[in-house]
């Protein structure tokens, strides 16, 4: 298992790749290649980065459909950073079941604080907290009892 810091960096680089894809619509492989050459990538968990980037970009419509009911505007009206964070975290909530939902939400909040707008982290937290109650029913109810 990789270190917490390496996993955090993998999420940061995956976020950068998703953001690039949202703005440019470049191919996933081109983005993957570009991001993997950015300074500091050697300290990231490469396997997790690839899994997050590919898993998210291959399922954008399904992932957006999961969080869309919890936002009060159209998905395309979200800032690209918030949208990318929600896509990434939704993918993790659905597919990385070995990662606790609270870790996923906390990592998303930290990404929003670093890269998002002033209150973006509050928005991301609210959406993901509601989404987790649907995608991780047993885990969330066990944590709240």
From Swiss-Prot:
Pfam families, per the entry:
NusB
GO molecular function, one example?
RNA binding
Instruction: Write down the superkingdom of origin.
Output: Bacteria
Keyword field: RNA-binding, Transcription, Transcription antitermination, Transcription regulation
The GO cellular component terms are: cytosol
InterPro entries membership: NusB-like_sf, NusB_fam, NusB_RsmB_TIM44
One GO BP on record is: transcription antitermination
Q: Is the keyword Transferase in the record? A: no
Family annotation (PANTHER family): ANTITERMINATION NUSB DOMAIN-CONTAINING PROTEIN, N UTILIZATION SUBSTANCE PROTEIN B-RELATED
Q: Which family does it belong to?
A: Belongs to the NusB family.
What job does the chain carry out? Involved in transcription antitermination. Required for transcription of ribosomal RNA (rRNA) genes. Binds specifically to the boxA antiterminator sequence of the ribosomal RNA (rrn) operons.
The name on file for this protein is Transcription antitermination protein NusB
Organism, by scientific name, is Aromatoleum aromaticum (strain DSM 19018 / LMG 30748 / EbN1)
What is the taxonomic lineage of the source species?
Bacteria, Pseudomonadati, Pseudomonadota, Betaproteobacteria, Rhodocyclales
């Amino acid at each position: 298992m990789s270190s917490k810091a390496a996993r955090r960096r993998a999420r940061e680089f995956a976020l950068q790749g998703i953001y690039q894809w949202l703005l440019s619509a470049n191919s996933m492989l081109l983005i993957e290649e570009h991001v993997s050459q950015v300074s500091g990538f050697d300290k990231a968990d490469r396997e997790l980065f690839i899994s997050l980037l590919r898993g998210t970009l291959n399922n954008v419509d399904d992932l957006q459909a999961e969080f869309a009911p919890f936002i009060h505007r159209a998905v395309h009206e979200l800032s690209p950073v918030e949208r990318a964070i929600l896509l990434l975290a939704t993918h993790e909530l659905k597919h990385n079941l070995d990662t606790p939902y609270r870790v996923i939400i906390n990592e998303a909040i930290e990404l929003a604080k670093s890269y998002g707008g002033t209150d973006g982290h509050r928005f991301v937290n609210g959406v993901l907290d509601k989404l987790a109650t649907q995608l991780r029913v047993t885990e969330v109810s066990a944590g709240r009892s």
